[in-house]
Regions:
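A long, amphipathic alpha-helix that forms part
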Residues: 1-28, 85
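C-terminal cap/loop subdomain of S1 sulfatases and analogous C-terminal strand-loop tails that border
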Residues: 38-39, 86-184, 206
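Charged catalytic carboxylate motif
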Residues: 7-11, 77, 210, 250
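Active-site His/acidic residue clusters
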Residues: 36-46, 59, 202, 224
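Soluble non-cytosolic domains of exported or imported proteins
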Residues: 2-9, 72-73, 189, 202-206
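Long, internal low-complexity/basic segments
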Residues: 53, 166-183, 188-262
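Substrate-binding rim/cap in mid-to-C-terminal beta-strand-loop elements of soluble/periplasmic
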Residues: 13-21, 42-93, 97-108, 125, ...
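Generic enzyme active-site microenvironment
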Residues: 33
């Protein structure tokens, strides 16, 4: 971990040195941000904070050093910020906003999505507001720990062993159990690790309704493609790549087509 941090620091230093040699440093914005999710369950490929909250640093002309911002920013906001910095008009079709603009209005919410990753078919949506996170799990007949590329990780084997021996506590079984709730609501201010699901808590009924509406509007406005099953071409490509690992029922359709052709 520390070696990775050191190497990253060295590489950023090399980039800055190259910009200075080329006379570009004083006229360049530098964005440094991470990939999504650490190599852990409930992080990589999922919509909890460990999977979607990215650290990001921006430095360059007009940006005061050592500032810390806590407002919501989406990954789709980076491109508009870059275009604006280069003096290029932001196209109207882009949903992102220039979060470096002087007249920028902080986002009221951010939406994130999870569909098929590798061969594992899933459908989850989340709405994040300054205080809450709302998650909608559409495929409730499938556990979070359905077969995936992570199965050979030592930690995956350990978790499955713990599940088989019933060594997991109630909090751990929220993610590693055989079922998942259709809705999850977390108070990020008081529960940053997203352990206490408040979706059925009467005290948070208003917040639940508000976040449901935000998601429903987003799905309608964007024409969320996750509303329909993936195309035969997409499923066939996954099937050819992953073979017998493709165990979700959606693959039965393309397997039948292949069988019919043969």
């Amino acid at each position: 971990h520390y070696d990775c941090l050191l190497k990253t620091d060295e590489q950023v230093g090399e980039i800055i040195a190259a910009l200075k040699r080329g006379g570009l440093y004083e006229n360049t914005l530098i964005f440094c941000f991470s990939d999504h999710g650490y190599k852990l369950h409930r992080h990589k490929q999922f919509l909890y904070e460990g999977g979607i909250q990215m650290p990001m640093m921006v430095a360059g002309p007009g940006i005061k050093p050592k500032q810390v911002r806590k407002d919501l920013i989406s990954g789709i906001d980076i491109a508009p910020a870059c275009l604006a910095a280069a003096g290029i008009k932001i196209p109207k079709h882009m949903e992102g906003a220039n979060f470096l603009a002087k007249d920028y209005q902080p986002r009221k919410f951010v939406v994130a999505a999870r569909d098929r990753c590798d061969f594992t078919i899933e459908r989850i949506r989340t709405v994040v507001t300054p205080r809450y996170k709302y998650l909608r799990n559409y495929l409730t007949d499938r556990p979070f720990m359905q077969p995936s590329y992570k199965d050979n990780w030592p930690v995956s084997k350990k978790f499955r062993e713990m599940m088989a021996k019933r060594e997991m506590n109630e909090a751990q079984l929220i993610f590693f159990g055989s079922k998942k709730a259709p809705e999850e609501l977390y108070d990020l201010a008081n529960d940053p690790h997203e352990i206490r699901n408040l979706a059925n808590d009467p005290k948070h009924r208003k917040a639940l309704a508000q976040h449901r509406k935000l998601l429903a509007n987003w799905i309608k406005e964007t024409g969320d493609k996750g509303q329909t099953t993936e195309s035969d071409a997409g499923l066939l490509a996954a099937l050819k790549r992953w073979g017998d690992k493709c165990v979700n029922p959606e693959y039965d359709r393309v397997r039948a087509l292949l069988k019919k052709k043969n």
